[in-house]
Amino acid sequence: DIVKTAQVARVSFYRNFNSISDVVDYITDELANEFIDKILPVLNSNDENKWREFLFDFINNALNNRGKIEAINLQNTAVLFSHLNTKMQMYVNVNSNKTISDKYTSYVKACLINNVVKKWIDDGMVETPEEIINYLMSFITLF
């Protein structure tokens, strides 16, 4: 079921994956890499328009990949968002020589987005993307 829901062709599954776990890893890696590539340019920015554009793209990506995300959630895992947090640790430099703000602000913003969007997906995406963006921006603009 996860192979079908995640839109992976059966032939591709047998040719490229050894298990359902491999499919989940592939999907999470693909989505996490896309998130990282898009967030890095805005992470240290205070430009509200850039942040809104990023959030709009990220949330629309979540909507467009809903089948894949739901397939992962059907396996009762938070693999995607755990994977995103792990990848953030690789890219966001937490250097002890910096101020607390320098060390943690980028990571806090990324984790905020990950966890709010995860909750939104888990709750069935009831609110509009605009409502979620406005909610997230109310926090992002504080930093």
Question: Where would I find each of the regions flagged by the language model?
Answer:
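Regular secondary-structure segments
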Residues: 32, 36, 40, 63, ...
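Hydrophobic alpha-helical connector segments
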Residues: 40-68
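Amphipathic alpha-helical packing segments from all-alpha helical-bundle domains
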Residues: 53, 74-111, 130
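Alpha-helical structural segments
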Residues: 5, 22-42, 53, 57
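Helix-turn-helix
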Residues: 1-22
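Hydrophobic alpha-helical segments that form the core
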Residues: 100-123, 127-142
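DNA-binding alpha-helical recognition surfaces that contact promoter or target DNA
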Residues: 15, 25-26, 134
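A short secondary-structure junction motif
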Residues: 34-38, 65, 87-95, 143
